Amino acid sequence: MERRSFVKRLAAALACLPRAATAFSRSTVPADGAAMPATSYSKGGVAASSPDYEALLAQHDVVYLSPATRAVEGLAVGDGDTTALVWTPPQGVTMTINKSNLWDDQPANYPPDWIWSPAWEEKATALVGGATLTVRNSTPLLDRMYLNDFHARLDLYRAQAVVDSESPLGSVKASAWGCSEPGVLVLDYDESTREPVSREIELSRWGSRRFFHWYSQYVPAATDTGLEGIRAGADPTHIWIEQKLRHISFAVVARFVGSPFKTAVRNSHLAAMITKPAMRMRGQVYLAVVTSEEDPTPLESARRKVDEAAQQGYDTLERQHSRRWADFWAQSYLQIPEEYLENLYYVTLYQLAVSSHGAYPPPFCGSLWTPNHDARRWGHYYHWNEQQPYWPVQAANHPELAVPYNRYRSEMLKQAESDARLVHHKGGAWYADVANRRGEQARSGVSHNLTPGTQIAMDLWRHYQYTLDREFLKAQAYPVMKACAQFYLDYLEKDSEGIYHVPKSSAYESAILQKDSITDLSSIRQSFPACIRSSEILGVDEEMRVRWREVYDHLVEFSTYGPGVNLQGKPIPKVFSSGVSLVDFTTTKASDGVEGVVIKKGQRLYGMSFECELAPVFPSGVIGLAQRGTEMFNVAVDTVLDVEPEAFRFYLSPAVQSARLGLGDHALKIITHITKDSQVLPQGFFTEDSLTPNAPVYSANRWTVDTPSIIRDGRRTNEHAQLLSEWFDMPSLEGGGQLMATLNEMLLQSHDGVIRVFPALPAAWRDASFKLRAVGAFLVTATRKAGEVQPLLVESLKGGTCRLENPWPQEQIQVRELASGRSVPVKTEAGIAMFESKAGSAYLVFPIGRAATEPELPQPRHGANQSPKTWNGNRIGMIRFF
C-alpha cells in the first residue's frame, strides 16, 4: 500500500459594527491597541464580563502587501458550504469557487482495490471544483509593475477578504464574503480607471483530471476528464454555468447589481457580463451554487438565491452577516505568549467555520480550497486525517462545526456493517481507513487496520460528552459505538486463562501483522466503558453491559519494549510496544526508517508505524494526568519523549499526546517543529510535509516536478512522467487541527470528566487566558498571571456535577454562584473538587480567603494588524514585492 510516504502521506449578538474604511485600516479598533470598553453578555440569566472580541481578532488579521498571483495563495471566504479563494492576478480580482457536495461519483461496480487500482485511476469518486469568477478590464490594474500601493486583508472578525489597490492606471476596492442566508457568495466591487474602459465579469468552468496519486501514478491520456457536460448560459440579468456529472448535476449562477451591463456566452465553458466603457464600475456580484441533490432544478434554485440576495440588498445582508460572526467569535477565546501560534489558531478556526457547515465534511487535503481546476491530492476520505481538523472544535466551543463529519460517519454505518461481514466475516461494523462520500470503502490493502471504526465512534462519543445532546447520542453516536464494539466482541479470542486477545491486526497503516496491537487495545479500553455509560444514559442494552464489562476486565494488558535499543540502535528506556509480530520480516528504510533489521515472529515491536505506541494517551485517553505516579504513566512519558524529531509530522499527534501528559515544553517543541515544516502558505494554511525534515510537499520553484509512473490501458508501466509540482500545491487541514488541539489541551483538559486548567503550559508561559468548553458542557474562563491562576468562571450549560482538579493545591476551594452570590457546597476527594451546578448558571471558583473576582479579560497586545507576521522563518501574510 502506498500512502503518505507511503506518505508523500455564546450569548447575545454584539452590536452590528461598521465596515472597515479600507483594506488596511480598522476604524473601530484603536490604532494604538487600546482595548475598547469591555461589554457584558447574558446567557441563561448569567451576566459576566466579556472581552473586546473585535480588538482581539483584529490583531490576527492576515495582511497582504502584494497581490496574490496564485490561487493557492488566495484569502479564504465562504458561507460554510460554498467557498472561494480570493486572489489578485494582473488580469483582475478572481474567486476560485468550491462547494462541499460537488461530487462526481464512481460507478457502482467498483473493485475491492478501487482506491489504488491503476485501472480505476481518474474513475473514483471525486469532489470537483465549482467555477472561477473574474472581474477584468483591458488594463493591467493589478500588475505589480504599475502598483503604487496594495493592501489586502482577511478581516477575521467580519469574515471578509478586502482588497485596496492604487496605480497610475486606476484603483480597485473590493470586499468578498460568504452569506449563509440565503446561501451566496458576495463580491462588493468598486473600480476606477484614468480612461473609459469596458469591464467584464466572467464566470467559467474548466474541469480536469484529479491526480489523486500525483506522486505515484497518473493517466496521461485522460485529458478530457471533467470537460464534458458543461454548458454556459445567460439571460439579461444572470450568467451561469451548468454541468452534468456522472450522477448529479449542478449550477453556478452570478448576478450583478450596479453599473449597466449586457450578458454574453463566449463558449460552452464561459459566460460574461460586459459593461459599456466608463471610468468607474461599482456594484455587487451575488453568486450561488446548487446541486441536483439539493434541488431537482439547480439552475432555477441558484437563480432564486441570487435574486433573493439582490432583493434584500447588500447593506442588509452585511448587517446580518456581521451579527452572525460577532456571535461566532463570542463563543471562545485564548491568549498565549506565542502570538504567531495564537494567530494560526484563530485563522484555522475561521477557515473551518467558513467551510464546515455543508452536506459533507471538507476533505482533509485541499478542503474546499483546491486552486487548480479539479486536481486534488489524496482525494478520498482517509479516516485519521479527516478526524484531525475536528479534534479541537468541541473544546473551542464550536461543536456545530463537527456536524457534517458526524453525520457523514453515522450515515456510513450500514455500509460498515456490510463490510464487516464481507471482509472479516464478523458482526458489528468495520470502518476502513479509506472511503468515499457514499461510504464505499477500501476492502483491500487496509483491511487489517481495525481501529478506524472505534476511533470514529469515539469522535461521536466525544461530541456527546461536550454537548450532552441526548438525541444525538441516541440517533447518531450510540448505534455506531455499539456496532463497532460488537465487531471487536466477535473478533477477539479468549485464551485458556480467560484473557482476551486481538489475534491479528495491523497498527494503523503498518503492513506488519501483529497480535495484540496497542491501537486495538487502546480503542477497546476507551470504547467499551463509553458504550456502558451510553447504554445507561439511554436505558437500553442492559444485557450488553455485562458482556462489555467482562471483556474489558479480562483484556490483555499493553505490552512494553525495553529498556534496550530501537531499530536504529539507539538506547531507549522502557516504552510501549505496538504488539507482537506474527511474521518474520526484514525492515526497509522506506517503510521502517532503517534498512535490513531482521524481525522474528513473536518479537515485540516498537517504532514501526506512525507512533502507534502513543495510542493509549491519545486519541484514546486511557492514560493521562489522572494516572500520574503509576508505572504506565511513566512508560507513556518515556514513549512520548523517545519520539525522534523527524517523527514530528503534520498528520501525527505527539504534540497532543505530550500535552495530555503535562509535558508543556515538549508539546511546544513539537508544534513549533510542525509549524516550521508545514505552515508555508501565506494565508495561514498548512500543507503536507515530506519525509525530509524542513521540506514540505509544496513546490520549491516553478520547475520542481513529481515523477509518477504512467498508466496505459489501465496498467501501470515502467515509464515515468514529469509533472509540475505546483499543480498540486494546496492546503492540508491536519496541521491546523493538530495545532488547535494541542493548544486547547495545554490550556484545558477534561477528557476524563475532570476539568484541569493550565495542565501543560511551557515553563516560560507565565501568562495565559482562555474561554473554552469542557466535557460535561461546562464553559470555563480562566486567566494565569505571573504564574498564578486567578479565580475561575465556570458556566454550566446543561447542569450536573462539576469536577475540577484544584488549581491551588495547597488551598481549599470555595464556589459561589455568580447571579445570586450564594455559596455552593463543595466536596473534595484526592484533589478533585466537586459541586452541583444548575443549567444556565455561572460559578466563581476561588481559594478560600481570596477575593471572589472574575478572571481578568485578555487585552489586545496592539492594534489591528497592519503587516505580515514572521516567526522562526514562517510568515502569515505577504510582504511587498514591488
Enumerate the predicted regions with their spans.
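Carbohydrate-binding surface patches
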Residues: 180-189, 776-803
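Active-site core of glycosidic bond-cleaving carbohydrate-active enzymes
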Residues: 382-415, 438-439, 445, 449-470, ...
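Acidic/histidine-rich catalytic neighborhood
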Residues: 483, 487-537
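N-terminal export signals
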Residues: 5-27
